[in-house]
Curated annotation (Swiss-Prot):
Its EC number is 6.3.5.-. GO terms for molecular function: asparaginyl-tRNA synthase (glutamine-hydrolyzing) activity; ATP binding; glutaminyl-tRNA synthase (glutamine-hydrolyzing) activity. The gene is gatB. One of its GO terms (biological process) is translation. Heterotrimer of A, B and C subunits. Belongs to the GatB/GatE family. GatB subfamily. This is Aspartyl/glutamyl-tRNA(Asn/Gln) amidotransferase subunit B. It is an enzyme of class 6 (ligase).
Length: 476
């Protein structure tokens, strides 16, 4: 029997607001424990929430960016549960009337096929506090309590861990590019839970699902889903009964561990939040918000393919971050050579950034100066080999290409008479070049070219050197 996985993701993203969802406390990351708090986010008696309009705006913006229908009349609800990091013993969230429904994200599979992953709903809610487990006991920090979130719930359309990674990668790029969330997984501003079950391939009914928590990176997401698929297949194959449960990914031991049996919706006793008014969203406001959505990464990638003729892979890599996409876009326009701009950014510049653990935002030279480097190589001022050395100096010092070329005397030698003299010198010192060439081993010319380039410290024009080496060998 062959099994397939059925996967749905629940993604929490902290919203880019200055203050919390129901009070005026800062949402700034960090700070001393329990200093970004007030009676409202601590749930003290007599305190009343007031919804931050910016939270609703960003929730609608997320829905529009993810092709959702926007709920015109909605409400907030109480989700009741008892846990130390939940100061009110309930969370103000949305149950029956989420702000957005029925969206989708298209992902491109390795085969080139485009697959649509449905989005069931997006709702706004408040974050909980944070528990810190120490040898002396468990401490609670309420700085995060009340920080606004959206939860993006996908439909169970994902079939492999690889598809899950593609979906989450694209979701993160959209939310980040649209300035909805900074999506920093390392700071907890993007968190992902996965629901996975198995079924016989080709059948419709869903199996018994497990919810997986603590998947704090893309690598952890794939490893956890792969492990859980194998665990469930092994259990079913051995005749064991699966149960609905919540499990967590143990990064140290590379396995999922049972936390508790999975709660059902009625366990939370949802009911409308009486301290907040009904949410009314007008068509005019929706259109105002729509106008604030910038060109999204996948739209940029499509434009780079159509406008610049880039391969899909290059366009995808260049749009992984807004900063890289914008840097390339400007350089491509200024240089008039998008492919060269793409090659430099994806090649040597990416290598240098990786070696120094820096980002495009940290580059000391502008797109205009990279375009200048492309131009001086194209017009023969320097060779491509020298261009790589110039780029390294630009990366380290932030000087313009022309300044570096002038200071170091790197201009390419295009003097045919001078180069011809060097060619003859190399051929005189290496008579085997002539012998081997005349016996049919034409590759030996590459050796002669290399020797001439060595004599000129790479500054001779390679095209001229190649031409003159061939001419002089033919004469002898």
């Amino acid at each position: 029997m062959e099994f397939e996985s059925v996967i749905g993701l629940e993604v929490h993203a902290e919203l880019l607001t200055n203050t919390k969802i129901y009070c005026g406390c800062t949402t700034e990351f960090g700070g001393k424990p329990n200093t970004h708090v007030c009676p409202v986010c601590l749930g003290l008696p007599g305190s009343l929430p007031q919804l931050n309009k910016r939270v609703l705006e960003l929730g609608i913006k997320a829905g529009l960016a993810l092709n959702c229908k926007i709920t015109k009349v909605g409400r907030m609800d109480r989700k009741n549960y008892f846990y130390p990091d939940c100061p009110k013993n309930y969370q103000i969230t949305q149950d029956e009337l989420p702000i957005c429904r029925d969206g989708y994200i298209d992902i491109e599979l390795e085969s080139g096929e485009v697959k649509r992953i449905g989005i069931e709903r997006i709702h706004i809610e408040e974050d909980a506090g944070k528990l810190l487990h120490t040898k002396r006991g468990t401490l609670v920090d309420f700085n995060r309590a009340g920080v606004p979130l959206i939860e993006v719930v996908s439909k169970p359309d994902i079939r492999t861990p690889e598809e899950a990674t593609l979906y989450l990668t694209k979701l993160r790029s959209i939310l980040s590019s649209a300035q909805i969330s900074d999506c920093k997984m390392e700071e907890g501003s993007l968190r992902c839970d996965g629901n996975i079950s198995i079924r016989e391939r080709g059948t419709e009914p869903f199996g018994i699902r497990s919810e997986i928590k603590n998947m704090n990176s893309f690598k952890a997401l794939e490893k956890a889903l792969n492990y859980e698929f194998d665990r469930q297949v092994e259990a079913v194959t051995n005749g064991e009964a699966l149960s609905v449960e919540t499990r967590r990914w143990d990064e140290t031991n590379n396995k999922t561990i049972v936390m508790r049996s999975k709660e059902q919706a009625n366990d939370y006793r949802y009911f409308p939040e009486g301290d907040l008014v009904t949410l009314n969203v007008s068509d005019e406001w929706i259109e105002e918000i729509r106008k604030t959505i910038p060109e999204l990464p996948y739209q940029k990638a499509d434009r780079f393919v159509k406008e610049y003729g880039l391969p899909k892979y290059d366009a995808h890599v260049l749009t992984l971050t807004d900063a890289m996409a914008d840097y390339f876009d400007e350089c491509a326009k200024l240089s008039g050579d998008p492919k060269a701009a793409s090659n430099w950014i994806m090649g040597d510049i990416s290598r240098l950034m990786k070696e120094e653990s820096t980002w495009v935002e940290d580059l000391k030279f502008s797109p205009k100066e990279l375009a200048e480097l492309i131009e001086v190589i194209k017009d023969g001022t320097i060779s491509s080999a020298i261009g790589k050395k110039v780029l390294e100096d630009m990366f380290a010092e932030g000087k313009s290409p022309k300044t570096i070329i002038d200071e170091k005397g790197l201009k390419q030698n295009n003097d045919e008479d001078a180069i011809r003299q060097l060619v003859n010198k190399v051929l005189d010192e290496n008579p085997q070049v002539i012998e081997q060439y005349k016996s049919g081993r034409t590759r030996i010319l590459g050796f002669a070219v290399g020797q001439v380039m060595k004599e000129t410290k790479g500054q001779a024009n390679p095209g001229i050197v190649n031409k003159l080496v061939t001419e002089e060998v033919e004469k002898r």
